[in-house]
Amino acid sequence: MNVQSLIKEGLALFKNKKFDEAIAKLKQALGQIEDKNSQIEEQNEIQAGLGRCYLEQAMKAEGKESEQLFGNAVEHYQQQLGLAEQLEDKQNSLQQQIYAQFGLGNCYFEQAMKAQGKESKQLFEHAVEYFQRQLSLAAQLADKQNSLQQQIYAQSWLGNCYFEQAKKAKGKESKQLFGHAVEHLQRQLRLAEQLADKQNSLQEQNNAQFGLGKCYLEQAKKAKGKGSEQLFGQAVEHHQQQLRLAEQLEDKQNSLQEQIYAQSWLGSCYFEQAIIQQKWERYF
């Protein structure tokens, strides 16, 4: 069986969540490439596939096993990055580097979500670093629409990193991190508005408004008094925008699903606000 056939089989196994078998098949494909200075595209694809397999396994594992699997994933994504940089077609090279940087960012993000305290903070910082590199590479893509789309993905992940950090932090640090999250999500929204495909633009704007609403809701739950009230108002405003965008989606089933999400989050806003108000009434 040739290298391409083995890669194809390996990726099919990955899609079926047979990760151990996929890893074995992809390593078999890599072993068939005797001259590692040749077949760079194939090697790039193999390393990306191995990174994805180990990442999926790491997310499900616990303790030292999870840590080791994350290490394996990072190693393969680093290998992919080195190969992507060697690709002769500059635009393809940039695109593959973007995928590798995203993979690395995702590895550290998922580790950070499992960790606590200083370790979690450090891992989030690594994730941000890789997502920033992803963003920088995305801005260099010649195809404007693809460049916008890839920048949207990077801004979304940066926003998510800061949002999850902010939830774990307290006081001024939490407030500052929420501010960073909002900043990236606002940039995501502005980029989404520039997409030429109207339906894709609406979907991406919807996603950004959801992220913004979620940020303000979490801040509101941590805040007190008038500050909390104002933040709840901002959360409601963004989820209302999310709802309006969802109503404009042409795919009826997707539109209904997105409207359900928006209505659910609006309900959460009012519910959380009522709970806090009730607590303050009891206090006084």
Feature locations, PLM:
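TPR-repeat structural position
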Residues: 19, 60-63, 70, 114, ...
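Hydrophobic/aromatic packing residues within the alpha-helices of TPR/SEL1-like helical repeat arrays
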Residues: 19, 26, 70, 77, ...
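Short helix-adjacent coil turns
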Residues: 17-18, 65-68, 88, 122, ...
